[in-house]
Structure formats: C-alpha cells, structure tokens
Amino acid sequence: MSTIIGRKAELKELDRLYRSDKPEFVAVYGRRRVGKTFLIKQAFKDRITFQHTGVSPVDQEGERNRMKTQLESFYYSLLNQGLEGVRMPKTWMEAFFLLEQLLMQLDNGSRQVIFLDELPWLDTPRSGFLPAFESFWNGWCSGRDNIMLIVCGSATSWILGNLTHSKGGLYDGSPTR
C-alpha cells in the first residue's frame, strides 16, 4: 500500500474542509503526474460518495463526438455508483440533474464527497458544461451543508480562468485552492 509523504499541510486542510459544517468547493490543480488524484483518494479513501474522471481528449475526433463521449462516460459513472432506471443524458444540465438525484438517493445525513477528476476535459466546445456545472454548484450544492465538491485537473489555466478567478457564474463562490 502506498502512503503520502510530505503532504501533511494539504491533508490537514482537506480534513478541516471535510469536517466543516457548510458546503465546500475545493479545486486541486497542477502539473500532470504529481499526485493530485492520489492525494484525494488517500485523503478520503472510502468517504467518496460520487467519483468521475473525464475522458482524455486525445484521439477523440470532432466536437460533437467529444461531448457525447464525455456524457456517456459520466452516465456510466452514475450507473456504476447506484443510479438506476434513467436514460443517458443529452446535455450537461440533464447530467448534473441525474447526479443530484443520485446524491439525494444516497444521502444519509453525513458528508457527501463528490470528486470530479480531470474536470477541464469535460468542458468540450459548445457543450454547455460550464453553465451546467455552475448551476449544479450554485443552485444545488451550495444549499446543502453536507456537500464537499472536489475538482481536480492538470489544465491549470482552465481551472484558474473558469473556477478560481471566474467573473461568471461561480464568482464569489469560487473554490478553496
């Protein structure tokens, strides 16, 4: 079993946010292969309620096909983690609605950790991902004290531009970095 070395401050901060009595939005970003995903998985082990990793855009042809691939993969994550009796979403707004349904179904009152890895890969051109994600956080997550939304990505400029320094829908609701 692997262990984390030299990340005590990060683990302490993640634990503090986990124990918070309000909704928390955390963004973890940085170069590829430095252990972002490993850090989150080790910090939360069996406490992750929903987890999804975006599909690499490499070898995906056409904007429409990339969006379809991302939505299909997200749908399979929903099914694998307990959602039943639903069709594949056609839009990101619908996909996040299905995630809300799953989270309500799984809610037992304890902290729900949602981990979206490689988040920038989900935002394909003209997919409507960012407004749907903003609606998910602003309209649903931020009203629930037991939600901890963690996003991860190696596309630092995307994370900074669209989440942490956003002047759009996440303005003043930007994540802890």
Predicted regions and their residues:
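Phosphate-binding site recognition
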Residues: 1-177
